Amino acid sequence: AFQGMALTKDGKQLDGLKVLLEEVERANKFGFTAVELERAKAQILSNLEKTYNNRDKTDSEMLVGEYVNSFLEQEPIPGIAWEYQQTKSFLPSVSLEQVNSIVKNYVKYYSKVIVITGPKKDGLVQPTENQVLKVMDEVKLAKLTPYEEKANIANLLKPFKSTGKIVKTETDAKLGTTTLTLNNGVKVTYKKTDFKEDEIVFTARSLGGSSLASDADFVKAQFVFPALAEAGVNGFSKTDITNYLAGKQVSVSPFIGNLTEGVNGKTTNKDLGTALELIYSYFTGLNYDPASFTAYKDKQSAMTANMLSNPQFYFSNEYSKFLQQKNPRFTNIIPLTEDWEKADYKEAY
């Protein structure tokens, strides 16, 4: 069955339902674009290739899952080698017309179930059946336009002449590591392992973190730090970058901790260059986009708004506040409404 889901603030369920139904109807009326299809194909093949390359070191839980499905659902277990080769063989032949026709078969106006959930609060009115039906009718009559694909990113970075040099190389025979010292003082330590056939895991950090901020600035910025990457880099939005990375195995996550700042991530041999470009971009080309922070804040607020009504969370939060008495850098274990009111995106940036 076809399913869709939207997460909204309290009292905004009907707005969320309308947006969700509009996007479903847009796909139903106009279908997906050729670029979207090729991006999806590339991602499917990239994920299968990664699993295939590590087929001799598959985690047990993945194997157990297949065995359980085979026993309970009589699902075949041909193995990743067969799945990868077969997918490589038939996936290119899947046409846009086939995909769009399947969407039309899935999206129907009859036999539809809509479930709306929300907290019970004084003054908060839940949507009625008639209101839901009205939204559905409005979407049916809405004059929607096809999704327009933006131009893809050709290059994440503009060409530039690198002045970086390796000024020192050291090895540690006991640890099996090699350390490269660069002319800017950065030290790069790497070690070859056989844990995975095609995986590079990395972390980069420097001392400092949020400890360098004053107590007053920290309170304004602490919950904004995770949102900074939402703005994208080098003038490209996060959506642009996500599309650019389709078909690549690249994960890069910048962070600012209490005592350190840096990036964590992983990639593959062939995508290492892209991962390094993204790391460089986070350091040198982070976008300033207050609108992206507002969207992030609204999304986080919707998820956490009702957590204090959970007895277990309420106890954990109050217990933490008790332990952190007179600590000017502690507010709550997760950002609540009063924390977002103090948040200052410009200060954090």
Model feature map: region roles:
Residues S111-K112, Y345-Y349:
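Non-catalytic, conformational "gating/processing" segments within enzyme and secreted inhibitor domains
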Residues V94-Q98, I102, N287-Y288, F293, ...:
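Peptidyl-prolyl cis-trans isomerase
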